């Protein structure tokens, strides 16, 4: 019968040496693979988010849409026309109803202004107002102008695979970087694997409570690419209410100059 002394000093000693060497090499390889795959996993998650963002944004765009605010006892609809150039510039014009027609919102880099023709005044919105409701909807000013970038202001990690609306999806967790001016504690993004379509987004506050869920649906080809034509923002604390944005038309990669996004043009945009 073998005992431990045989392995340490007896005829099995040389095999013990080989076994130790084998175990060291084996675990070294495992650790290297795990570390390497972790890095690739993070890189893949960031690339997925980047491709998804490019799919929806393009280099530039001109769009027309409607926004319907739904409440338990009433609803109202707003017509919108929008121009964008990259992630730095955007101009939003209200086209209906008549009482709001002509109101405009301008974003240049991280600054935002609003133009109210009824009072003939341009107002710069301070950062403290970015989380306030936009036009009485469930979208915020930050949602409107995307002051924070889901690509550059967050780290990304694939945390699960799932299925939504018949699409195989990645569930990706976005954690804000320390230096980023981000209002959310974290975000969960559900992205279709093959199409790079974002189908669901969950927004959590700094205490990790769910604040809003945004559901994308009605996938169709618009502007030469496949995108969700409908977005619904649903607050977690008031699930009986929601705001629905539906794209009527959109054109991508259209020629727009930076000079278009000016306070002067905000007043005369049509």
Predicted regions and their residues:
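Hydrophobic residues embedded in beta-strands of well-ordered beta-sheets
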Residues: 89-90, 112, 122, 198
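Short, low-complexity, charge-dense intrinsically disordered segments
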Residues: 5, 10-32
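Gly/Pro-enriched, hydrophobic low-complexity segments
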Residues: 121, 145, 165-262
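Flexible, processing/modification-adjacent segments and terminal tails
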Residues: 43-60, 66-68, 75-76, 101-104, ...
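Sec/Tat signal peptide C-region and signal peptidase I cleavage site
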Residues: 38-42
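Hydrophobic core
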Residues: 33-37
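Extended lipid/amphipathic-ligand handling interfaces
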Residues: 52, 80-84, 216-221
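N-terminal, post-signal-peptide region of Sec/Tat-exported proteins
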Residues: 64-99
């Amino acid at each position: 019968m073998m005992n431990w002394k045989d392995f340490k000093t007896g005829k099995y000693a040389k095999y013990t040496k080989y076994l130790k060497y084998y175990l060291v090499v084996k675990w070294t390889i495992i650790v290297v693979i795990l570390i390497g795959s972790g890095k690739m996993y993070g890189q893949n998650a960031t690339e997925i988010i980047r491709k998804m963002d490019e799919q929806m944004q393009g280099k530039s765009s001109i769009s027309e849409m409607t926004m319907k605010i739904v409440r338990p006892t009433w609803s109202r609809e707003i017509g919108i026309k929008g121009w964008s150039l990259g992630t730095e510039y955007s101009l939003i014009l209200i086209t209906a109803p008549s009482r709001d027609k002509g109101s405009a919102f301008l974003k240049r880099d991280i600054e935002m202004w609003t133009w109210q023709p009824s009072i003939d005044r341009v107002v710069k919105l301070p950062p403290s107002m970015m989380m306030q409701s936009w036009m009485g909807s469930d979208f915020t000013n930050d949602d409107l102008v995307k002051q924070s970038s889901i690509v550059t202001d967050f780290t990304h990690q694939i945390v699960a695979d799932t299925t939504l609306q018949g699409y195989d999806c990645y569930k990706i967790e976005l954690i804000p970087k320390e230096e980023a001016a981000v209002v959310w504690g974290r975000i969960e993004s559900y992205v279709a694997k093959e199409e790079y379509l974002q189908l669901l987004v969950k927004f959590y506050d700094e205490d990790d409570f769910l604040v809003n869920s945004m559901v994308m649906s009605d996938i169709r080809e618009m502007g030469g690419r496949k995108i969700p034509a409908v977005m619904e923002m649903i607050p977690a604390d008031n699930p009986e209410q929601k705001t629905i944005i539906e794209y009527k038309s959109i054109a991508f990669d259209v020629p727009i100059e930076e000079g278009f996004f000016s306070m002067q043009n905000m007043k005369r945009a049509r």
